[in-house]
């Protein structure tokens, strides 16, 4: 089997396909993968496609990264129970610029090699394609019955009280024609995409056959990632895990991968990383010999954080993890940036105190009872006497100590700790 295709299959990145893949991939090919820039960041679920593209690029094939500036404005009805809200072209252009930077961290645009990736925006040709010309050139090649039989359209029509606008109905035709354009202008013969995009891929294949007489094109899809327990992949506590660190901090990103189950980690480390499969097999053996060491989760979290962010951000995330779960120090707390600190504290009990009170000084006993697990002043004194109470990771040994503004982290926070793992965050307002 062709080595590029074998690696995709072995990593779980190939489910269904069409065309003669072995014959086509016997020589270097140009292939494309598309992203509709509906947000100003890609999510972790997009990484599957980028890794698949990187694998093919590593084997000598040229990726076209297609951003759907035009199709994004129309809206893909796949998996949607109602029509998506319209996105302005200004927002689309902004989103394109943002995701371009993220994609460039994984696929290689800068290489002088003939298979350096290129980025194409379908808005660049659709903006000048007149409606009457498109209907005449493309619309007459595909019947309404054909489009209505597509699963994404059919499900919307079958849903009671629902329907589909002509705008969304046209999405499959616009998306299918993308393949024709890339075939004509770049010699692109292969599309890769998630399984949910198979219908649009086949439309592109059919249009190529009818418009160009092309029978030498192929498509590859992968199953959408899901967690073993049935949870939707790519979300934590109901929120999307983004690649943009302003939307999901590197610490939260690191924790997302670190908290995967054993079963999911074994699958995901193949799907989302480029770690050689032989090395992964050894990691799996090591993990099974000592599951509590969480070897797979740690390696997965390290690789993903370094790839999407940087080694520096990975090291910061590890240090931040030690705040609540390890032996960090007051100095460690002071060195962590505020967004990371707040991400670590997301689930910690919080209490607000007037900043003026802290500026004037508060007795440590009065401060200690602000902790939700410290029941009284006498309880606070016992904790301090028994070395069981800390502020900012420093043990409190004097129950007459005064807490003042010099102790504030970033000029506004105090971390109160009872015992080893019970925390309250004081926020000076």
Question: Where is each model-derived feature located?
Answer:
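Conserved nucleotide- and phosphate/pyrophosphate-binding catalytic cores
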Residues: 208-429
């Amino acid at each position: 089997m062709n080595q590029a295709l074998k690696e995709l299959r072995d990593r779980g990145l190939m489910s269904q396909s069409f065309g003669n893949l072995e014959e086509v991939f016997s020589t270097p090919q140009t292939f494309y993968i598309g992203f509709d820039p509906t947000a100003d960041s890609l999510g972790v679920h997009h990484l599957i496609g980028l890794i698949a593209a990187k694998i093919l690029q590593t084997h000598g094939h040229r990726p076209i990264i297609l951003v759907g500036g035009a199709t994004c404005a129309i809206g893909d009805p796949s998996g949607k129970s109602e029509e998506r809200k319209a996105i302005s072209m200004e927002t689309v252009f902004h989103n394109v610029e943002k995701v371009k930077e993220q994609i460039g961290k994984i696929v290689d645009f800068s290489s002088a090699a003939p298979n350096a990736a290129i980025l194409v925006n379908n808005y660049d040709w659709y903006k000048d394609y007149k409606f009457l010309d498109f209907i005449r050139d493309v619309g007459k090649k595909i019947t309404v019955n054909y489009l209505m039989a597509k699963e994404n359209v059919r499900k919307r029509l079958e849903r009671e009280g629902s329907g589909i606008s002509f705008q969304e109905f046209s999405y499959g035709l616009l998306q299918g024609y993308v393949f024709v354009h890339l075939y004509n202008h770049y010699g692109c013969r292969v599309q890769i995409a998630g399984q949910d995009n198979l219908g649009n891929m086949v439309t592109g294949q059919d249009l190529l056959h009818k418009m160009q007489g092309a029978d030498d094109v192929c498509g590859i899809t992968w199953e959408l990632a899901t967690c073993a327990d049935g949870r939707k992949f790519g979300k934590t506590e109901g929120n999307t895990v983004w690649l943009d660190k302003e939307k999901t901090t590197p610490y939260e990103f690191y924790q997302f991968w670190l908290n995967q189950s054993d079963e999911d980690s074994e699958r995901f480390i193949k799907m989302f990383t480029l770690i050689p499969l032989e090395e992964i097999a050894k990691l799996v053996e090591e993990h099974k010999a000592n599951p509590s060491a969480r070897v797979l989760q740690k390696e997965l979290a390290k690789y993903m954080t370094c790839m999407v962010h940087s080694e520096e951000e990975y090291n910061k995330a590890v240090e931040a993890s030690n705040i609540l779960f390890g032996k960090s120090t007051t100095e460690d707390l002071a060195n962590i940036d505020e967004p990371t600190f707040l991400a670590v504290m997301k689930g910690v009990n919080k209490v607000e105190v007037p900043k003026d009170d802290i500026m004037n000084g508060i007795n440590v006993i009065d401060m200690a009872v602000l902790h939700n697990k410290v029941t009284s002043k006498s309880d606070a004194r016992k904790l301090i006497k028994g070395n069981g109470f800390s502020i900012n990771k420093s043990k409190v040994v004097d129950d007459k100590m005064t807490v003042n503004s010099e102790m504030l982290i970033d000029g506004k926070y105090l971390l109160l700790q009872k015992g080893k793992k019970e925390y309250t965050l004081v926020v000076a307002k």
